[in-house]
UniProtKB/Swiss-Prot annotation:
HAMAP family: CitG
Listed name of the protein: Probable 2-(5''-triphosphoribosyl)-3'-dephosphocoenzyme-A synthase
Similarity annotation: Belongs to the CitG/MdcB family.
MF (Gene Ontology): ATP binding; triphosphoribosyl-dephospho-CoA synthase activity
Keyword ATP-binding applies: yes
EC class of the enzyme, as a word: transferase
Pfam families noted in UniProt: CitG
Gene name per UniProt: citG
Catalytic activity: 3'-dephospho-CoA + ATP = 2'-(5''-triphospho-alpha-D-ribosyl)-3'-dephospho-CoA + adenine
Keywords: ATP-binding, Nucleotide-binding, Transferase
Membrane-spanning parts: none
Top-rank taxon: Bacteria
Length: 294
């Protein structure tokens, strides 16, 4: 039974990756309509990447489940080692293009945490779609001890480093913690914002529209390192402001798609891509599938 459930959950993670890239239109991002602000990747590049990562999803679950009683730091190291192997498989499939490096990091953590949670909640092994809102929140919380050391390890002695990564510069200059911060805090954007928003939207509209609305909402709130890297703080804040206006409008699905398509043209012209938002959309969809919301 455990193997079947883990196979099913692994497929949900793959499904989340495929749903994200398929959702269209997504401003600045690769989708079924165009390549967004990317000239080195396409829809099929993302499909190849997702399929290359898929075999590792069950490995992440196994690590969390079978090592649940170990020190969280050791579990993290196991997940990181397998995550690096997955990353290498991704780069091999995409011929060196970084499609899913960031979200692979997060999926390793959240699938590992899902395995840990199942070790403590064996009744869930009988029904893969029986997860509740409380289960999702608990899984996010389990990431905290896994990543408690990350910020201190990665950002603790930046004043002593001669060369800084872009993420390190963002932290020093603006206090933006990026994916490390989101993980170390138990994915609050997903648990307390994205998932409640998506659940509510799905009660009043169809699945595609709800996902597009979630995309807009996330773009209006996320500290998107990809946007900042490409356009700077000012450009990121402008995108957030524009998306907040769109979020607060009451557009039909057709008008929403038209607005997103027009904004896609704008972001392409400025070479801006909200990749951080895309990653959080994937993770939100993963939990929505676990809860059988989608």
């Amino acid at each position: 039974m455990t193997k079947k459930v883990f196979d099913d959950i692994s497929r949900l993670a793959l499904k989340a990756l495929l749903y994200e890239v398929s959702l269209s239109p997504k401003p600045g991002l690769v989708d079924q309509l165009d390549n967004g602000a990317h000239d080195d990747m396409s829809f099929l590049t993302f499909v190849d990447s997702a399929l290359a990562l898929a075999p590792f999803f069950k490995i992440y679950l196994d690590i969390g489940f079978y090592h649940a009683k170990e020190d969280p730091g050791l579990i993290f190291e196991r997940l990181r080692a397998s995550g690096i192997e997955a990353e290498q498989a991704m780069f091999s499939a995409t011929k060196g293009v970084n499609t899913h490096k960031g979200v692979n990091f997060s999926l390793a953590l959240l699938l590992g945490a899902t395995g840990m949670y199942l070790a403590d909640q064996p009744q869930l092994l009988d029904h893969v779609t029986a997860f509740t809102e409380e289960d999702s929140l608990a899984i996010c919380q389990l990431v905290k001890p896994l990543t408690a050391h990350l910020l201190e390890t990665d950002f603790g002695s930046l004043d002593l480093k001669k060369e800084l990564t872009y993420g390190e510069k963002l932290f020093l200059d603006y206090g933006i913690k990026g994916p490390r911060g989101e993980a170390s805090e138990g994915y609050p954007t997903i648990a307390h914002k994205a998932l409640p928003f998506l659940r509510k939207s799905l009660r009043s509209t169809d699945q595609e529209t709800a996902q597009l609305q979630l995309l807009v909402y996330l773009m209006s709130i996320v500290e998107d390192g990809n946007l900042i890297h490409r356009g700077g703080i000012k450009a990121w804040r402008q995108v957030k402001q524009d998306m907040l206006l769109l979020h607060n409008s009451s557009l039909s699905t057709a008008d929403l798609k038209a607005a997103l398509s027009a904004y896609n043209d704008k972001l392409i012209q400025k070479n801006l891509s909200p990749g951080g938002t895309a990653d959080l959309l994937v993770l939100s969809l993963y939990f929505a599938f676990l809860e059988n919301q989608l």
